[in-house]
Structures are given as C-alpha cells and as structure tokens.
Amino acid sequence: MKGIKEAKSGTTLAGKNKNSYLNRLRKLNFVNTKIDAVVCQLSTNDARFGYEIGEMSQSFNLESFDTETTLGAIEYIIKYVQTKWCCPVIFYTCIRENDVTYKQLVNHLYRLKTKWDIHIIDVYNNDELNKLAKSDKEMMADDSHPTKKGYRYLYTPILVKQLDEIL
C-alpha cells in the first residue's frame, strides 16, 4: 500500500476556503489508480476558526449537506469518497486537551460512523496515548499538535495497527 499525503497546516473541514479539506479533495484526480482508503483527520481547527458543528443530516444526497458546518463537511467528504472511489473512509481523532467542542465533535463522529459505515481510529479517547503525551512533554508542541517524537511514538503505532486491521 502506498500513501499520498494531502494535509495542509491550519486548514478546516468546513468552509469554502480554497485550502479546506473539501476543496482540496475535489481537486484530486487519480487516473488509473486504485484507492485503498481515504484517511481523514478530524480537524481541530474548525472550532478555532468559528465553524459551527452543525447537525447530522437525514439525507444521503451529496448536495444536501451544509458544508459551512463541520458535520455537513464530514458527510460531504464521506459521500464524495464513497461515490468517487468506492473505498473505506477512515477518520482519526486527535489528542486535544480541555476542548469541549472537540469532544462533542468526536461524539458526533461516532453517530456518523453508524449512519455511513465509516471507520474511526480514536486517538482522542485512548487513555494510554493521552497519559504518554502528558508524561513526556516532548511529545506535543502544544495542546493539539504532536512533535516528530509525538508522531513517532503516539500516532504512528496506533494508525499502523488499526489501518492493518481495517484494510
């Protein structure tokens, strides 16, 4: 399996910004390439930049999602990927200290998991990883961004293990 990194620092799931997850996703054009899965971070930036969480839609129609809200953008991404590439969609959550909005977003993601049959790699609720991040201050650059050491010892092992299980 080969990975393609399309992440950009400081971007959001929701919104019409040219660097939003949605706009970057729409620009991807993989010709004659089998996509094994799309892995997407549950952004910590949406709340910081003032996007509302929104509501889970009852619809499965791509055009009905409110992409100016985080949940609407997530549902759009899921439907877009499932339609365009017919592959699993995997969201991973982040270590985030004292952020009630992010906790709510993680809880909503589990409701979306049921609706859309997506996968979640839950770093946010992983007690072992959170304890390790708190005990070694070199793991995190701030309350939500891992350092290289944090990626190496916190995120990479759980992502590799769970991606192997999912795929």
Segments (PLM) and residue ranges:
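Conserved SGNH/GDSL esterase-like catalytic core that processes O-acyl groups on lipids
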Residues: 1-64
